[in-house]
A protein has these predicted regions:
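Serine-esterase "nucleophile elbow" of acetyl-processing enzymes
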Residues: 35-109, 122-131
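Internal alpha/beta domain cores that form substrate/cofactor-binding pockets in large enzymes
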Residues: 63-65, 102-130, 143-169
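Cell-envelope and extracellular/periplasmic
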Residues: 71, 79, 108-114, 136-144, ...
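Extracytoplasmic/secreted envelope proteins and their assembly/folding machinery
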Residues: 88, 92, 120, 152-159, ...
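Catalytic His-Asp segment of secreted/periplasmic serine-dependent ester chemistry enzymes
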Residues: 175-250
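Structural beta-sheet core signal
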Residues: 66, 137, 171-172
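N-terminal export signals
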Residues: 2, 8-31
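A short acidic, helix-capping loop that chelates divalent metal ions and anchors anionic groups
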Residues: 73-77, 117, 143-146, 178-182
Length: 250
């Protein structure tokens, strides 16, 4: 091989190496983006977890705001409200076990019987004023009254308003209604849950698929009524299932 041919070969090999390295870098970036896009439980709340481990005087109050209907409000068998057995406070109890130095507020802005359209109307006044560090939205169960389109519009409004304030957002799919077949994929409730899952993916935010968690538990041999206090409200055992799903982010 002559000197000229040798130089061409070396340059070609070098360019091949550069392109391969570039391709690897692009693939790595795409992989990183995909991890973030799915609201990965291991890292979505990383900045919040870093705050939760700080000790006085470096720590600050962390506000967890729960916006939704009667379930996060703590309604069991209406009109009985069992605040300390509902998932926001079961979550707080578990968080304090692993973050003993943290000051954590669980703030309820829920109203029993409310749907997402109603919740969106008071969102700025009743939710954003609490300056949430993490916002949980749980309206699917009651959104059957307003339909998919109105529900989506309302959820998107709240999501966008929260993200504009750099708030971490975690969406929750529905807890069960015993009048609805959990295994029927064509129900209005399942369609709403699917839409919520799509919104979480679209906006790269967190998702707790409570509906799927109940489906899996029942498919494994559980009895749905064992998790319910009335036809459409979970009992403490059902609330614990939701709290367990949220805890995976912490």
């Amino acid at each position: 091989m002559g000197n000229s041919s040798r130089r061409i070969f070396i340059k070609s090999a070098a360019m091949t190496g550069i392109m391969a390295s570039f391709a690897d870098s692009v693939f790595a970036l795409e992989g990183s983006s995909n991890l973030h896009a799915t609201g990965e439980k291991d890292n979505y709340l990383e900045s919040i977890k870093q705050e939760l481990v700080k000790q006085w005087p470096k720590n600050r109050t962390i506000n967890l705001v729960f916006h939704g209907h009667s379930v996060p409000s703590g309604f069991f068998k209406t009109p009985d409200v069992r605040t300390l057995q509902s998932y926001p406070h079961l979550l707080l109890k578990e968080l304090k076990q692993i973050y003993p130095y943290a000051v954590i507020n669980t703030i309820l802005t829920c109203i029993g019987g409310e749907n997402a359209a109603q919740g969106a109307k008071r969102f700025k006044r009743d939710v954003l004023n609490h300056k949430p560090d993490v916002l949980f939205i749980d309206y699917a169960l009651n959104d059957r009254r307003i339909g998919l389109d109105a529900s989506r519009e309302s959820w998107e409004y709240m999501i966008k308003a929260a993200l504009k304030k750099n708030i971490k957002v975690i969406l929750l799919t529905a807890t069960p209604d015993q009048k609805v077949d959990l295994n029927d994929k064509a129900t209005d409730l399942q369609k709403l849950c699917d839409q919520i899952t799509g919104l979480a993916n679209q906006y790269k935010i967190g998702l707790v698929d409570s509906y799927a968690a109940f489906q899996q538990r029942i498919s494994a041999g559980g009895v749905l009524s064992d998790y319910m206090s009335q036809v459409n409200h979970p009992n403490e055992k059902g609330h614990q299932l939701v709290a367990d799903g949220i805890m995976k982010y912490f």
